Amino acid sequence: MRKDVVLLVGGAQGSGLETTMQVLAPAYASLGYGVLANREYFSNIVGRHSYIHIRVSSSGEARPLYYPADFLGAMDAETVFTHWDDIGEGAFLLYDLGTARMRLQQIASMEPDLRSRLMQQYREAGIEPFTVEKVVEYLEREKRVRVIGLSFTALFDVLIKKHGLSRAQAQRFRSSILIGAIAGLTSLDREALDLGLQRRFGSRPKVLEINRDFIASVADEVEKEYGAQLKLEPAEPKSGEYVVASGNDVVAMGKVVGGVRYQAYYPITPASDESVLLEEFEGLKIDGESLGSIAILQTEDEIAAVSSVIGAALTGARASTATSGPGFSLMVEALGWAGKNDVPMVITYYQRGGPSTGLPTRGSQSDLLFSLFASHGEFPRIILSSGDHLEAFYDAIEAYNLAERFQMPVIHLLDKFLANMVASVPFPDWKAIKIDRGKTLFKAPTGPFKRFPRDQPLADRPVLGSGAITWYTGDENDEYGHIDEDPVNRLVMYERRWKKMEIADREIPEDFRVKYYGDEDAEVLLVGWGSVKIPALEAIERLREMGVNAAYLHLRMLSPLPKRRVSEVLSRFDADRVIAVEANYLGQASKIVTMETGFMFRKYILKWTGRPVYLHELVEGVLDIVRNGRDKVVLSYGK
C-alpha cells in the first residue's frame, strides 16, 4: 500500500474527462483521503486535448501535484503520445487497443510544435515508426510500465447489448472505463464510488444505473487481472467535515456567507463558473425559511458589469463582479471612479495568461502590478490574494468587510490554477466568520450630507435611499460631493483618500496579511503569493528531508503590504538565500516588496507557461539555486 497515488487521465475535450474528476474526487474524499485535482484544457469546446491530474493522499489533506504519475489513462491516441514521459518507473498505462496502430502524424488536433518535439524525442529513444503500439512497447521495455490494453469497442458492444444503447450513446460512457480501472487498481470502496456517482448522476437514474454496472464490471476485471497495485493506506484520522469544491465554487460560497446581494458579470474564462454557481443561490432558503435573495446580472459587457456594481454598492448592497484580465482591462476607468468616491465594491479577479487574449484557459500570476496601478491617477485600493481553497473562502467574505470598513475598492486576486483545481477542503469554522459593515448608514438625517468631510477619512456612509442627499461625481469634489477644483481643496481631499490606506495598514492585523511557514532558524526563504503556497508548503518539508532547512513567506495582502513584518523576516536571511517564487516573468510581488522595504531580490524561480508550479520542479529549482549558485531558474514542466 502507498501513502499517495498520482493519476493522469487524458482525452479529447468533451469526452467526459471532467466526469472522471467529479466522480473520483468526492469518492476518495468521503473515505477521508485528501484530494487535489487540476484540469488543463484548450480554448475549445470539443476535440482538442484535455487532461485531469489528480493526487490522492492518505494524509487526509489536499496535497500539491507532481510528476511522474502512477497511472495514465488514455481515452485516445493523442494522450499516449503527449504524456508518454509523464509516468514513472513501474507505473500503469491504460489505453484503447483500437488505437494501437495510430500514427503521430494522424493526430490532426495536435499543435505542430508539440508534434515536432515528440518526433525528435521518439527518434532519440529509438521509437520508430511513431505509433501508439511502439510507444507502449518502449514504456514496457524501458520503464517497466504495466500496460492495461482494453478494447473500448468490445466493451461498448457489451454495453450496447446489455442496455439497448446506440453506438453513439455508448461512446458517452468512455470515461467510465477509466473510472473503473482506477477503482480496481486502487481497490476503491464501492460505497464511496457510488457516492461519487450519485453526486454526478443522481438526477438521471437510468444513466446512474448504467454507469454503476459498467464501472463495476471494468473495476472487477482490472482488479482480478492486475491486482490492487495502487491501493492506498487507510486515510489518517481527522476531525470535522470536508467539502469537495473548486476555487470558483468556494469563492461563490464565501460570497453567499459574506452577504453578497448583487453580482454582475460578463462571461469570461476562468471567472464565469463562480457567477454561474451563484445563480443557483439567487433565492436563499434554509429549512424552508427565506433568507433573502441575490441579484445576479449577466450584462452586455464588463463596463456595464462594473458600473452596475458601483450603483448597487452605493445603495448599501454588498456588491461584486468576477472577471479576468481582458475584462478587468475594460473596468479600470470605473475602478478609478469608485476609488475617488469611496465606493466599497469588490472585484474578484481570476488571472489567466496574457497579454491580449493570451492563454485564455491557462493560468498566470502576471496581473499583480496591473491590479496595483490600474486606472489613471492615484487612489487607494486593497489587494487580497488567496493561497488555497480555504483562504479563498474566507477572503471572499473578508473582501466585503474590508471594502466597507475602509471605504475603498477591494481586488480579490486569484488565478486559473486555484479557480479550476478541485480539492477536499476542511469545512469552514463559522465562529471565525465576522461581518463588518463599517460606517454604513441605512437611515440618515434628511437633507444635504457631508459625505466627504475633510477631517474624517472614514466618515459615515449613508446609502442611497437613507434620507440623506449625497452627490457623487468623477471630478474632484468638496465635502458634499460637489465639483471643486480649488487647489487647497484638492490638497486636502487627495490626502484624505490616502489616509484611509494608512488606517488600513495600521488596523488590519499583520498575521492576516502575511504568514511565515517553517523553522525560525531556517537558512533558505521562499517568498511567494497566491497559489504558489500549495506546492511551497510541501516543498519546504521535502527540502528539509534533503538537508536544506527552508521556510516559506506567504504574502496574502499585497496592498497595503505588511512591510514591517516582511522586512523583519527578510532581515534574518542572507540575500542569496531568499528566493522569489512566482508564476510570471518579472517577479512582480518581489518588485512590490523591494518598492516597500528596499530589500533587493537576487534569486528567482519563475514560470510563465500557463501550467501550474509543480512540487517536483519547485524542489529541483530550489536545489539548483542553493547547490549550484544559480540566480534564476525558469520552470517549464507541463503539457
Swiss-Prot record:
- Write one Gene Ontology MF term: pyruvate synthase activity
Entry's pH dependence statement: Optimum pH is 8.
What EC number(s) is this enzyme filed under?
A: 1.2.7.11
- Gene Ontology BP terms: response to oxidative stress
Binding locations of substrate: 269, 352
On temperature dependence, the record says:
Optimum temperature is 105 degrees Celsius.
One matching Pfam family:
PFOR_II
InterPro entries, alphabetized: 2-oxoacid/accept_OxRdtase_asu, 2-oxoacid_Fdx_oxidoreductase, PFOR_II, Pyruvate:ferred/Flavod_OxRd, Pyrv/ketoisovalerate_OxRed_cat, Pyrv_Fd/Flavodoxin_OxRdtase_N, Pyrv_flavodox_OxRed_cen, THDP-binding
Ordered alphabetically, the record's keywords are:
Oxidoreductase, Pyruvate
General function of this protein: Catalyzes the coenzyme A-dependent oxidative decarboxylation of different 2-oxoacids such as pyruvate, 2-oxobutyrate and glyoxylate to form their CoA derivatives.
Which PANTHER family does this entry report, sorted A to Z?
Answer: PYRUVATE FLAVODOXIN_FERREDOXIN OXIDOREDUCTASE DOMAIN PROTEIN (PTHR32154:SF16), PYRUVATE-FLAVODOXIN OXIDOREDUCTASE-RELATED (PTHR32154)
* Name of the protein in question: 2-oxoacid:ferredoxin oxidoreductase 1, subunit alpha
* Organism (species): Aeropyrum pernix (strain ATCC 700893 / DSM 11879 / JCM 9820 / NBRC 100138 / K1)
